[in-house]
Amino acid sequence: MSKPVVSTPLCSILHELRTAENSGSYFQPKLRSLKAANPKLKLLDVGSGWGHMGCSLAQALGPAGRVVGVDISPESISHAREVAGRCGLEDRVDFVQGDAYKLPFADNEFDVAHAHQVLAHLERPWDVIAEMVRVTKPGGFVAIREGDLESEIVYPAEPGLLKFHKLIATAMTARGKGGGGADTGRKLLPWALKAGAKRDQITVSYGTWWFDTPEHKDKWAKAMTGQVRDGMVGEIAKKTGLATEEDLEEMATAWEEWAAREDSSLAMMHGEILVEK
């Protein structure tokens, strides 16, 4: 990846909410089928970040399975290994540094290759899908899930939140340079086809994220305010003049007020694909 997407403590706030159960239900039936035939499954988690999803996937595979997470950031790899240790999974999960555009693995090495909320950040996501297919064994599958920010609904739709939505969508699209962006979830099928997969190999589905409990709203709001005050969104806004300091503070305050409300909620669609090999 030419410009690494580095997980931060603010990113980790949301990563901790992601599990194989709530973010991987679309591939669980196929995973169970493979596991019944071979308990010693090997799964690759591409863009593994701080390791929370990889550890959850290891628990889903069971004691005989193994997960390898790959990420461009050495800081993320170090933290992911700490997470695996805290979960008691260091013998079943490993994390290695590598480039998603050129995965450091042999052809046909994994039963499953998985990515979650990764392609939205990349300029050539179809090339990453092709790499994931390459390292997957015949009879295995690739599983990818990506958010579609353009489908987001939020209540109440306060002006500061609407400004934020427009800004982050613009920032993501600019960063993707014609690849990933704010509408990534709906593009997984054409990208898989561009990667060389045949249509009858691909299964498409859609899922939903929603945040309505105080705990989950607080985590979401902290991550979004972090993006505005210290993260990618604020950085791009300042460099390009898309928003002033006053605009950014209005957005951050709007998220804090949204999280504190009893009647607030948010939902977003996610695209999901399985590519069978």
Report the location of each language-model feature:
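Conserved alpha-helix/loop element of class I SAM-dependent methyltransferases that forms part
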Residues: 16-40, 56
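Class I SAM-dependent methyltransferase SAM/SAH-binding core
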Residues: 41-102, 127
